[in-house]
Amino acid sequence: MKAICIISGDVHGKIYFQQESANQPLKISGYLLNLPRGLHGFHVHEYGDTSNGCTSAGEHFNPTNEDHGAPDAEIRHVGDLGNIKSAGYNSLTEVNMMDNVMSLYGPHNIIGRSLVVHTDKDDLGLTDHPLSKTTGNSGGRLGCGIIAICK
């Protein structure tokens, strides 16, 4: 199965999702433009609603009610993808990752939800900041889009 997310906002780009079956990892690839230099939190959020910009996307997709964590952590939100790294505004930021928790299949699938690029680095739930266990203290939302099935 394949899906696509067209990111818009201060940051824009295309992110593709591909998964051969429910038992296989999810491949996430694509690019972003106009992303400031540094690390930026990258998460699937609970709602596929961008009617009020990225704020209407809700919180991180967390159907299992876990604390926020790194993509490879045992305890994490389903929607936690960690950070993406940008070389700066004038560069293309490539995205290429695999995830073993997120899926395009089953009751916790991400189809119809939103993908959000954040202003700040995701601390992966590892700091004492009050937002660390809920958002990774990753700040505001630079861009977002709705994940949709594609050919």
UniProtKB/Swiss-Prot annotation:
Catalytic activity: 2 superoxide + 2 H(+) = H2O2 + O2
PROSITE patterns in UniProt: SOD_CU_ZN_1, SOD_CU_ZN_2
Cysteine pairs bridged by disulfides in the record: 54-144
GO molecular function annotations of the record: copper ion binding; superoxide dismutase activity
Root EC class: oxidoreductase
E.C. number: 1.15.1.1
Record's function text: Nonessential for normal virus replication. Could be either non-functional or with a low activity.
Protein name: Putative superoxide dismutase [Cu-Zn]
Species assigned in the record: Autographa californica nuclear polyhedrosis virus
